[in-house]
């Protein structure tokens, strides 16, 4: 008898948990806010062919935001929002050393400068966004270290794009 009630109890518990979460206002993060704020976004990119720029355009397209690349000498439309993104800066510095006085751990910092404007008003004044990670260097596996740095840098770019999208969704932009 108890074996038959156990699956029902699990189902009831799961259902109650879902109802409680939706009742308190919890919902998965979505890009609806972004697409409702910006139908079209003009992008002024320092390097339109960089990996960061491609990830940003792909993410904005996934959020149903139409993007137009703005050439550096072109006159922007007055009623459209312009997102200016500078070149990504990648800095690498040693954090710790091993007994042989060689760097054992490094910190990688990836940063970009952004600004958002519409007409004469600045929605987001020029600011720097950054992400940092650390990794251990294996002296015996230099090739593996390079691969690890490339993987970490790609993850950091994705995180920086997500950070930028969340910044664009900020409630301060609703005015």
Where are these predicted regions, by residue range?
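N-terminal segment of the mature soluble domain
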Residues: 39-89
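Surface-exposed short loop/turn segments
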Residues: 81-128, 134-147
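Acidic/histidine-rich, surface-exposed loop or edge segments in extracytoplasmic proteins
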Residues: 36-44, 141-146
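Sec/Tat-exported extracytoplasmic proteins
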Residues: 45, 60-67, 89, 116-120, ...
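C-terminal/domain-edge helix-coil "capping" segments
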Residues: 143-175
